Amino acid sequence: MQVSVAEISGILKKQIAEYGKEAEVSEVGEVIAVGDGIARAYGLDNVMAGEMVEFEDGTQGMALNLEEDNVGIVIFGEGLAIKEGTTVKRTGRIVDVPVGKGLLGRVTDGLGNPIDDKGPLETTERRLAEVKAPGIIPRKSVHEPLHTGIKALDGLVPIGRGQRELIIGDRQTGKTAVAIDTIINQKRTHETDSPVYCIYVAIGQKRSTVAQVVQTLEENGAMAYTTVVAATASDPAPMQFLSAYTGCAMGEYYRDNGMHALIVYDDLSKQATAYRQMSLILRRPPGREAYPGDVFYIHSRLLERAAKMNDEHGGGSLTALPIIETQDGDVSAYIPTNVISITDGQIFLETDLFYSGIRPAISVGLSVSRVGGSAQVKATKQVAGTLRLDLAQYREMAAFAQFGSDLDATTQKLLHRGKRLMELLKQAQYAPLSMEEQVVSIFAGTRGFLDVVDADAVVKAELELLKQMHAKHSDLLDTIRTSGKLDADTETKLGVAITAIIKEFLA
């Protein structure tokens, strides 16, 4: 068999022409030390701060410490296969996460990867987890209400869209319950043209607790407009630290596209603890309470991203409800004072109130909303205007009344009314009230219609009142809802209706 030279050269030329494989160039370093979720690598000379890197077993990490001769990398995951000599390469991208409506109804980890066994996420858009907060010019002052469905809050500590309102209190005082109720109450907004989408970020919590929250949201039909980001207690500290920024990026998608979002960080105390752990292992100098010097900045740059945008920028909003856990009611500790100074007000929950049966255990005297007043619905403002003062006078007189039994008629009347108002502010969990229902309840309390009811029966009387209002006077409720205010005519009709219902209740 003879093979011609021309044939061979033709085959070779063809193969050379078709050979077009490009060599993949990547900057690779080598791990020189690893331990406690931190790896130090040598050779990644051009790595950026906050850049994602990948170890040879596929585990991801983030470059945090850029030193002269090595790079400190926090590891996302177990990292059991990472040892001295393991190669690590740059990815060239800063941490980014999936965003969009495809995340609604889903549960993700601290990096936005799904962990709910419902398949891949139906979203293509990604955003950087860490971005600069909007400047002063694109913002607008808070002026639209965000109803929580909780009488004590909407009446006394109103929250507006785009506000940052801190929920602070000891463990087991109902902080998460307030946040979950607020998420459940946003279901009403989905019947209007400006729905509020919700993100719940669980930081350092037990998996069983997160599962319980997801189940509660599903049972109340709230998962349809909610995304849960969970970095649980068993996740590495870097994941717990990053999860808040991941959730925030998801919320910013709605804010920047002219929609409204609510984000709950539960809780930032555990995020600060995770950051302290990372910083100490990275040998950063410790400051007060062993937290690093920039612990204020990690919370301020996160919470400043909650904003109400002006109309030229779409008019969207991102409202933040950060949660802080105190030790024995000490709000003057480092992290609580930091977050109080960053936020636009705080809801203070007290253990004593909780155990005395006043739930939600909101301390009316210590809770404030610095910007929410301008977002409050006029009807609520009209009926709840005197409520804070009435309660303050009641608390003062109640303390005074312990010392003596001889009280004048005015004081006795004040104590009598105050007791009923305290009872009126009680509310069952997962039972948020609409704005018009709250107006009716508070109106009945502050205008003295409930003075004839025994203090123990106030909660029952209120339930009956709302039930009868829906059954017989739904037109009045509709008027309050549509107009958003109480005119003289509506007030008179409401007074007559409430008097009749209470009379029937007492009969």
From Swiss-Prot:
Pfam families found in the cross-reference section: ATP-synt_ab, ATP-synt_ab_C, ATP-synt_ab_N
Catalytic activity: ATP + H2O + 4 H(+)(in) = ADP + phosphate + 5 H(+)(out)
Binding site for ATP: G169, D170, R171, Q172, T173, G174, K175, T176
EC number, UniProt record: 7.1.2.2
GO terms for MF: ADP binding; ATP binding; proton-transporting ATP synthase activity, rotational mechanism
GO cellular component: plasma membrane; proton-transporting ATP synthase complex
Site entry: Required for activity: S367
Membrane topology of the entry: Peripheral membrane protein
InterPro entries from the UniProt entry: ATP_synth_asu-like_sf, ATP_synth_asu_C, ATP_synth_asu_C_sf, ATP_synth_F1_a_nt-bd_dom, ATP_synth_F1_asu, ATPase_F1/V1/A1_a/bsu_N, ATPase_F1/V1/A1_a/bsu_N_sf, ATPase_F1/V1/A1_a/bsu_nucl-bd
Sorted UniProt keywords: ATP synthesis, ATP-binding, Cell inner membrane, Cell membrane, CF(1), Hydrogen ion transport, Ion transport, Membrane, Nucleotide-binding, Translocase, Transport
EC class of the enzyme, as a word: translocase
Keyword flag Ribonucleoprotein: no
Family: Belongs to the ATPase alpha/beta chains family.
Subunit structure: F-type ATPases have 2 components, CF(1) - the catalytic core - and CF(0) - the membrane proton channel. CF(1) has five subunits: alpha(3), beta(3), gamma(1), delta(1), epsilon(1). CF(0) has three main subunits: a(1), b(2) and c(9-12). The alpha and beta chains form an alternating ring which encloses part of the gamma chain. CF(1) is attached to CF(0) by a central stalk formed by the gamma and epsilon chains, while a peripheral stalk is formed by the delta and b chains.
NCBIfam families in the cross-refs: atpA, PRK13343.1
Function: Produces ATP from ADP in the presence of a proton gradient across the membrane. The alpha chain is a regulatory subunit.
Protein name per UniProt: ATP synthase subunit alpha
Species whose genome carries this gene: Magnetococcus marinus (strain ATCC BAA-1437 / JCM 17883 / MC-1)
UniProt gene name: atpA
